[in-house]
């Protein structure tokens, strides 16, 4: 077992038809770390996430969840690895015809043999964790966008994953609600010790939660920077990284904006 490594990617190359999407990507994520995959639109960050959670196979390279190589392992090992992860996609993907509680209960009912009463207790615990206590009976259409994100987080946490993958968790949210989601991510990491891997281009969220960041570049299809948010902010050896991290609105030093290019 690779000591203190929750997940890693080694020499990952991805092509769709003849188009190169990711080129020779390698990095590792420590246990209990909040790790951000950063890049503008078209940089391949969501593609990388899909490969890390086993939804797609690369042209070459390896993805490890804990010590299991999910790109080459047997089916039984593959599902063992998947049991270690939870995923929240950008849309939150709640089933509209099911209540919030039923959405959160879905993976528990599908992958365990717990009784209905036990599942109800687990759902209550998860919803309380994300600040949605007593929202079990609401439909997704009856709650706000921020609440949908919280419900999606509760469902992603339903089976107590060691690693939580979040795809643009604050996308489409107003700044106040986005900051609340950032606080929730920090709280989950602290209380549960969950390793959290986030795909985003939201600079405010990166500085709020990330311990370490990799930055993908659309033109080279590769990692062009890696480090803490402050290290990347001060990395002006690379003009693109410098521009991405140091643009301001209204010529102030505090109001970071997104460069989604």
Show the residue positions of the predicted features.
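ABC ATPase NBD coupling module
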Residues: 70-86, 116, 233-236
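Short coil-to-helix segment of the ABC ATPase nucleotide-binding domain corresponding to the Q-loop/switch region
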Residues: 98-106
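Conserved ABC ATPase "signature" region
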Residues: 117-134
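Conserved ABC ATPase signature
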Residues: 139-143, 147
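Catalytic Walker B motif of ABC-type/P-loop ATPase nucleotide-binding domains
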Residues: 164-167
């Amino acid at each position: 077992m690779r000591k203190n490594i929750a997940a890693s990617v080694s020499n990952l190359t991805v092509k769709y038809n003849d188009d190169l999407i990711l080129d020779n990507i390698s990095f590792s994520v420590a246990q209990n770390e909040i790790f951000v995959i950063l890049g503008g639109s078209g940089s391949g960050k969501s593609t990388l996430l899909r490969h890390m959670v086993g939804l797609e196979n690369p042209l070459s390279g390896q993805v490890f969840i804990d010590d299991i190589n999910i790109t080459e392992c047997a089916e039984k090992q593959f599902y063992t690895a998947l049991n270690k992860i939870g995923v929240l996609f950008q849309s939150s993907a709640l089933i509209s015809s099911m209540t919030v509680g039923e959405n959160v209960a879905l993976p528990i009912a599908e992958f365990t043999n717990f009784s209905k009463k036990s599942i109800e207790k687990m759902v209550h615990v998860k919803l309380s964790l994300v600040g949605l206590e007593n929202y079990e009976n609401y439909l997704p259409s009856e709650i706000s966008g921020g609440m949908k994100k919280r419900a999606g987080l509760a469902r992603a946490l339903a089976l107590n994953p060691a690693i939580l993958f979040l795809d643009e968790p604050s996308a489409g949210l107003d700044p106040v609600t986005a900051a609340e989601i950032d606080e929730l991510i920090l709280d989950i990491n602290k209380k549960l010790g969950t390793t959290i891997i986030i795909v985003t281009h939201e600079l405010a969220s990166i500085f709020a939660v990330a311990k370490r960041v990799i930055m993908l570049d659309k033109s080279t299809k590769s990692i062009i920077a890696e480090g803490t948010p402050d290290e990347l902010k001060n990395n002006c050896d690379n003009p693109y990284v410098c521009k991405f991290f140091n643009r301001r609105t209204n010529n102030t030093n505090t109001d970071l904006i997104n460069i989604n290019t």
